[in-house]
Regions:
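Formylglycine-dependent sulfatase
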Residues: 1-405, 409-412, 420-448, 452-460
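Residues forming the ATP-binding cleft of Hanks-type serine/threonine protein kinase domains
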Residues: 417
Length: 460
């Protein structure tokens, strides 16, 4: 709380930051999906500002979370793919970085993380060493959908119930304990990541007999029945997320905290479900029968690493009653890097001195000011588990260039104006040579700006 010159206390706004895992922008009723059932999310997105071009700079768990916490690229901090707890036991978020949660903690916020961490298992990477007073959840990337093993009060224990319900129960208790002071709650669900089953009847039943429409039914060799089955299961998981977000919002209403609470909803990356013949995210898998034959040892069978829009874009909204206009939208690109400076500005917390901040403070746009910045998205993904790549991407209004500096035969150019579904790679067409040169120059400039280690591997 702050004491103003006039005397009375001005309560700082609370922050509830909800992060899902593997949720695509299309997995939202409001997006026009024919089957997604998300009434609570649809309502939240209308109560504040819907960020329609919200994206992540790396479309996989750990690097995306690194960028969210630090406003830096994963390549700058040595986290370039999902952290494998067995093969990479000593990898995590560099404790020397100052996260935005640490800045809020230093400013007097009571901070809690409930749910998935995936930024290092050893004690030196523990969430309570990275700006959280309280942690309940799991440090690794995965967990069971039901009866998960969670860290509760510092000890691992198996907890009865569905994981998303258990995490929400704990989040509500955190809010209850801190309702009389300024708090930051980060609620990181693992859903709708696989595994999707089992699900409570309330989430599963509406989709059980559904014959879903799928995006690319005519894709050659697409395993249509499998894609339909996965779509049903995925939508049930999304419904479970929606139901639980509704519980959190209702709780804020009941405690009369909604007016003074900034609520952010977003995801760690997007997802494909049959789109372009694949399922999954940036480390995509073919959903074909049979999978294409292997032509490159770096890209094993069934793997389709990518930087598709469905992988990088995420469903995102921010609500702050009385400050951010309801039913508002923002059509300019907003990266996960941008939350760090933006949330600190919104809560009047100073930026930590000496920290490198790559993100843009989008506060003026949230407050309705007419403000414009370039319609450009830049991303990076060096896969090293399921495949081996060095993908770097630049996306403008009309074009997307994806360079794979390890496997140049995989380079892609998409004409987004005429082919928004990214179905045709037009990099070989002579008329596009100038576009490729220009975008390639932009990629190299971005790489140099962040001292990307892959620069050393590029042949001049």
């Amino acid at each position: 709380s702050l004491v103003s010159a006039e005397g009375p206390e001005v309560q700082k706004p609370n922050v509830v930051f909800i992060l899902t895992d593997d949720q695509a922008p299309w997995a939202l009723g409001l997006s026009g999906h024919p089957h997604a059932d998300t009434p609570h999310l649809d309502k939240l997105f209308k109560q504040g500002m819907w960020l329609k071009k919200s994206y992540v700079v790396t479309p996989v768990c750990s690097p995306s979370r690194t960028s969210l916490m630090t406003s830096r690229y994963g390549s700058e901090l040595g986290v370039t793919d999902w952290i494998h707890p067995r093969n990479e036991p000593d990898l995590g978020l560099n404790p020397k970085t100052v996260t935005w949660t640490e800045a809020m903690q230093s400013a007097g916020y009571r901070t809690g993380l409930v749910g998935k961490w995936h930024l290092g298992v050893p004690e030196k990477f523990h969430p309570t060493k990275t700006g959280f007073d309280y942690f309940m959840g799991f440090r690794t990337g995965g967990n069971k959908v039901i009866r998960p093993t969670l860290e509760v009060n510092g000890k691992d224990q198996q907890v009865d119930g569905y994981t998303y319900d258990i995490l929400t129960d704990d989040a509500l208790r955190f809010i209850d304990r801190n309702k009389d002071r300024a708090f930051l709650l980060c609620l990181h669900y693992r859903a709708p990541h696989t595994a999707w089953l089992p699900q409570p009847d309330s989430d599963r039943k509406p989709f059980e007999k559904l014959d879903p429409k799928i995006p690319n039914p005519d894709f050659p060799n697409l395993d249509i029945e499998r894609v339909k089955r996965m779509t049903r299961d995925y939508l049930g998981s999304v419904k479970g997320i929606d139901r639980n977000v509704g519980r959190v919002l209702k709780h804020l209403d009941q405690l009369q905290l909604a007016e003074n609470t900034i609520v952010v909803f977003t995801s760690d990356h997007g997802y494909s479900m049959g789109h372009n013949g694949i399922w999954h995210k940036g480390n995509g898998h073919w959903a074909l029968k049979p999978a294409p034959s292997v032509t490159n040892p770096n890209i094993p069978r069934n793997q389709r690493p990518n930087m598709y829009d469905n992988s990088i874009f995420v469903p995102t909204a921010i609500r702050w009653p009385g400050k951010i206009a309801p039913n508002s939208t923002l059509d300019l690109p907003v990266a996960n890097l941008d939350w760090y400076p933006t949330l600190l500005n919104l809560t009047d917390v100073p930026l930590p001195k000496g920290e490198t901040i790559r993100g843009r403070d989008i506060t003026p746009a949230l407050m309705g000011k007419e403000i414009v910045w370039p319609d450009v998205c830049y991303g990076e993904y060096s896969t090293h588990h399921q495949s081996k790549t060095h993908m770097r991407m630049i996306r403008t209004t009309n074009w997307k260039l994806v360079r794979d500096f390890l496997n140049p035969e995989r380079d892609e150019l998409f004409d987004l104006k005429n082919d928004p579904a990214e179905s045709r790679n037009v990099i070989a067409e002579k008329k596009n040579a100038g576009v490729v040169r220009e975008l390639h120059t932009q990629i190299l400039a971005r790489m140099k700006a962040v001292k990307d280690p892959v620069l050393k591997k590029i042949k001049p």
